Amino acid sequence: NIPSETIFGEASETFNGRLAEPIEKNLAPFSDFLKAHSEFAFGVATDGDADRCGVLLDGGTWLSAQDTIVLLTDHVINNKKTGGDIVKTSSVTGKLNLFKKKNRKIRDVQVGFKYITDEMVKGGVACGFEESGGFGFSFHIPERDGIASALLLCEMLAYSNCKTLSEYYAEKKKKFGEIYYDRIDYHFEHPNRLEILPHFAASIPQSIAEFKVLDTLSYNSSRGVVNGLKFILEGEARWLLLRSSETEPMFRVYAEGSSDAEVKSLLEQGMALIQSYNNE
């Protein structure tokens, strides 16, 4: 019997005056609650339909979705001994390559959980993750489920000798290392902006921010046009992802590297690459 408490559990058309997305800036009241109640091991918040979740450590500190993904992957693969590949959207941390083995691949798909579901339905998948807090597991249903994810976090902690999630996270961080990741929304007006990523998919730069480009992954829209381009760079968990919006003059730029400064540099290089497009 594990004591628990629910806050903001009542139905609210306005989600108590906040956006329903379970990200750090929307969970300030939850963080304040945990700061005032040290008896809780951690906290989990879901969005309105409970298919995504966000995690707070005891004490109210935000645990990023990327860190949550690594912890859940470790639990599913190493504690629960679940067989199969790991599916991740292109914006999820490259740290998941640490779980790659001869009989376990990492399947990289474009952003959107429906692409993870497609892989889960094909079979041979242990779990699937998207950067926005949607997690799915082969022993459940081929869909993201925030409540199932919360229960797995409880189970994960029960497998350990740790009393709190912050203690558990500190131990695992020694094993897996720090994750340095960020994303920005880049407003860019260009009459032929939807041609930018197809251009660079056909003319790949040899290096970005002085790192050699080892591989590229391209993702197509429903119309068959490249709307996502990921550059895999030399080093561990180092990459740059560019995604274009078809409905607004916007590019989403994502990066992971070995330090905050490096990630900032990669994001700047991503914006510079977009700016460099010249359709003469």
PLM feature spans:
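Gly/Ser/Thr-rich active-site loops/lids in small-molecule metabolic enzymes
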Residues: 6-8, 61-80, 146-154
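Short, charged, surface-exposed secondary-structure boundary motifs
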Residues: 12-19, 73-76, 116-121
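Short Gly/Thr/Asp-enriched flexible loops that form oxyanion-binding sites at enzyme active sites
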Residues: 51-71, 96-97
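Short helix-loop-beta junction
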Residues: 1-7, 98-103
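Well-ordered alpha-helical segments embedded in enzymatic catalytic cores
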Residues: 26-33, 68, 72, 115
